[in-house]
Amino acid sequence: MANKFETIEAANRTEFGKGSARRARVAGLVPAVVYGADMESNLHITLNHRDFAGLVRRNGVNAVMELDVEGVKQLAMIKHIDQNVLTFNIDHVDLLAITRGEKVEVEIPVIVEGQPAPNTMFVQDADTIRVEADALNIPEEIVVSIEGMELGSQITAGDIKLDDDMTLVDDAELLIANVVLPAVEEAPAEDEEGESEGESEA
């Protein structure tokens, strides 16, 4: 659980537009915006790209951090990361300002582990589930096991055991994973084989 959070330094942005954002990225910075219900206006900042990317690697895409914006502290969590589709560099970040004890809705990755019954396989239908959780207590992932499950068995969102301080937001019937028969590769039709043999003899 994310009971602890890291501090990351930020600076106020004074320039806006595509040109200024491009210059910031060239300088190793990530443009970001911080918003929240209790904020009078959005806060536009820049983050150190290396520091922020490291925070995401260590804490996941729902990471909570303490922003130090030129000496002013603010708790925030990641809401959206805009990545370049070619370089995968982080182009822009949306951050939600939060307070201790606040509940937030987040999508948490679901990891399926284990092996179903022999001669079956599992299909994962949903990679995430949406829950409401304490902003400072969000798990990086939720693990479900399909170990030994028989053909036709299913796991729905409602089957997943959540911590006491978490509430499922998704439909309880949302299908997460199910056990099916492996796909069978069809053999070539006999007449096609015969035609091939006849052609080769000719």
From Swiss-Prot:
InterPro entries: Rbsml_bL25/Gln-tRNA_synth_N (IPR020056), Ribosomal_bL25/Gln-tRNA_synth (IPR011035), Ribosomal_bL25_b-dom (IPR020057), Ribosomal_bL25_C (IPR037121), Ribosomal_bL25_long (IPR001021), Ribosomal_L25_dom (IPR029751), Ribosomal_uL5_bac-type (IPR020930). GO terms for cellular component: cytosolic large ribosomal subunit. CDD domains: Ribosomal_L25_TL5_CTC. One of its GO terms (molecular function) is 5S rRNA binding. Gene3D superfamilies: Ribosomal protein L25, beta domain, Ribosomal Protein L25, Chain P. Coiled coil: none annotated. It comes from the Bacteria. Keywords: Ribonucleoprotein, Ribosomal protein, RNA-binding, rRNA-binding. One of its GO terms (biological process) is translation. Belongs to the bacterial ribosomal protein bL25 family. CTC subfamily. Part of the 50S ribosomal subunit; part of the 5S rRNA/L5/L18/L25 subcomplex. Contacts the 5S rRNA. Binds to the 5S rRNA independently of L5 and L18. This is one of the proteins that binds to the 5S RNA in the ribosome where it forms part of the central protuberance. This is Large ribosomal subunit protein bL25. It comes from Corynebacterium efficiens (strain DSM 44549 / YS-314 / AJ 12310 / JCM 11189 / NBRC 100395).
